[in-house]
Each structure stands twice: as C-alpha cells, then as structure tokens.
Amino acid sequence: QPLKKYLENNSSYLGICVGMQILSDWGYEDKTTRGLGIISGDIKKFKNKKLIIPHMGWNTINLNKDDTIITNSFDKKDFYFVHSYIFQNIKKSDVLAFTLYGQKFPSIVKKGNIYGVQFHPEKSHKHGLNLIKNYILKS
C-alpha cells in the first residue's frame, strides 16, 4: 500500500520488468493477482506457443511517441529483455514504445510521472544507462 499511495500522488517512478508489471490492474502468472491499478491493463503470458519463453536477450524498441525522458534517440535501439509475461489490454495512449517478439507488446509505458520498462536498462549498455540518466535528470 505505501507504493500505491506514493504513485497516486503522481510521484516520479521508474518500474523495471516486474516493477512495470505491478502497475497493471491484474496479473495472471501462477494465480490471478491484483496489481496496483495505476495503468489499466493485464499481465499475461506471451500468446504465441512457438516462442522460446522466457524472451531473453537483445531486442529493439520502437517508439510510438517521445517525451522528455524517452526521446527519439532511443527509437530502434536494442535493449536487454528477460521476461515471460507482457502488458496486454492497455490503452494505446499509455504506451510509449513497443517491441516485437512473436507479437507486438508494450516495452515502455507511461502515465503522468510514472514510467515502466519491460527490459532491463541496467543491463542494456549505453542506451540503458542513457535512459536511466534521462530519468534521474528530468524526473
């Protein structure tokens, strides 16, 4: 509850991987679990049964739109992913970037001052470090 209260005050937040997923309404990993409900949507397993899960390795993000932290300089850059579940049923207006891995999924989400990234910027070399730097300097 302290995190939800903090986020409801439009405080600055950068959720990484599961830290992004907890922003959703519901998660369906082992059992149905209520999320924080900050960004509407659900966390579900990849739909494509032919994919190797977890999605692990480098993949490209594609910006829908940029803002002060997630700028055009990140478009078409590779970041490091390790996950089996993705944000689904999310409003397009809450998605800053998407990635393709058997299907299109949100890789960066935003609502107010709250950001979530499905990838691991701390493992993503210079692009990841630049994203973290932008977040620290501009949030």
Give, region by region, the residue ranges found by the protein language model:
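Amide-donor transfer/coupling interface in amidating biosynthetic enzymes
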Residues: 5-8, 41-139
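Cysteine-nucleophile active-site neighborhood
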Residues: 1-57
